[in-house]
Design a protein with these regions (language model features):
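Residues forming anionic-ligand binding surfaces in small-molecule and nucleic-acid pockets
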Residues: 1, 84-102
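Flexible, glycine/proline-enriched loop segments at strand-loop-helix junctions
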Residues: 1-2, 62-63, 101-110
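Acidic/histidine-rich catalytic neighborhood of metal-dependent amide-processing enzymes
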Residues: 3-82, 132, 217, 221, ...
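Short beta-strand elements
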Residues: 75-79, 89-93, 228-232
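Acidic-enriched catalytic cores of C-N bond-cleaving enzymes acting on peptides and small amides
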Residues: 82-86, 105-135, 153-227
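Single conserved hydrophobic/aromatic residue that forms the stacking wall/gate
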Residues: 233-245
Length: 245
């Protein structure tokens, strides 16, 4: 990828004594994809150079004159739990294409975590729903390809809503995600469901969380200036729902 190409180019220049150039310092850091932890922790006091070339293109000989900034938001929602007399079921949203949250956020592809919120909201419109657990996403820089949720609700109503949601989402995402699917099956869990208030708050978080392109560049046609990706959600402990974007 782009990081490996950059390291190879820097090492090749350092290794070739026939190339004319001013003094060069090569700075190589780790964890660029998952939060730039290496760059954040580097001690620059020993560097003498005052100009930096950021080699972050995927083609040899191409230099990108820019710098992409990013911030990670970690949101924790406290939840309460109580018993609820309805069967437990597992809802799965799957079949999405996904992609890189930086280079492919403008493709209009479905976000599995946010679509799960829409499914849960649709179930809640037709029957009493209690959320037990929800999880989705693999990396904070990847568009989620799916999500799963354990719920307590009327089984027949839930099955019908999931069937309709599959049809609706396949029509909505027929170009970008034609294989999207919503399934439901019986499940078991020892965890109590969230209460009504916590369920509503959790579903609202998934549905209303900003996601996708927010602002396009006014200077460069087709360039995304600001975007958000609802990348990860899970129960970090029984009384805490955590999402990352």
């Amino acid at each position: 990828g782009d990081d490996g190409i950059a390291v190879a180019m820097a090492l090749a220049v350092l290794d070739d004594e026939s190339l004319p150039h001013p003094p060069i310092e090569a700075v190589i850091t780790v964890d660029e994809e998952t939060g730039m932890d290496g760059a954040m922790g580097i001690d620059v006091s020993g560097l003498k150079g005052r100009r930096m070339l950021n080699i972050d293109s995927e083609d040899e000989g191409v230099f990108t004159v820019s710098c992409a900034g990013g911030a990670r938001m970690d949101c924790v929602l406290p939840v309460r739990r109580e018993a609820f007399a309805a069967p437990v079921q597992r809802i799965t949203v799957q079949g999405l294409v996904g992609g890189h949250s930086g280079t492919e956020i403008d493709k209009g592809r479905g976000n599995g975590v946010q679509l799960m919120g829409r499914v849960l909201a649709s179930v809640a419109e037709e029957t009493e729903l209690r959320l037990v657990e929800v999880c989705g996403g693999l990396k904070d820089n990847a568009i989620p390809t799916g999500a799963q949720a354990l719920i307590s609700a009327n089984a027949e109503v839930t099955a019908e809503v999931c069937r309709r949601m599959t049809q609706s989402l396949r029509e909505e995402y027929r170009v970008t995600d034609p294989d999207v699917e919503v399934t439901v099956e019986p499940a078991e869990t020892a965890m109590l469901p969230m209460d009504a208030v916590s369920t509503r708050r959790a579903v609202c978080l998934l549905v209303c969380h900003p996601n996708g392109v927010q602002v396009m560049s006014a200077d460069i046609p087709g360039l995304v200036q600001t975007s958000l990706n609802l990348s990860l959600i899970h129960i970090s402990e029984p009384t805490r729902l955590r999402c990352i974007s």
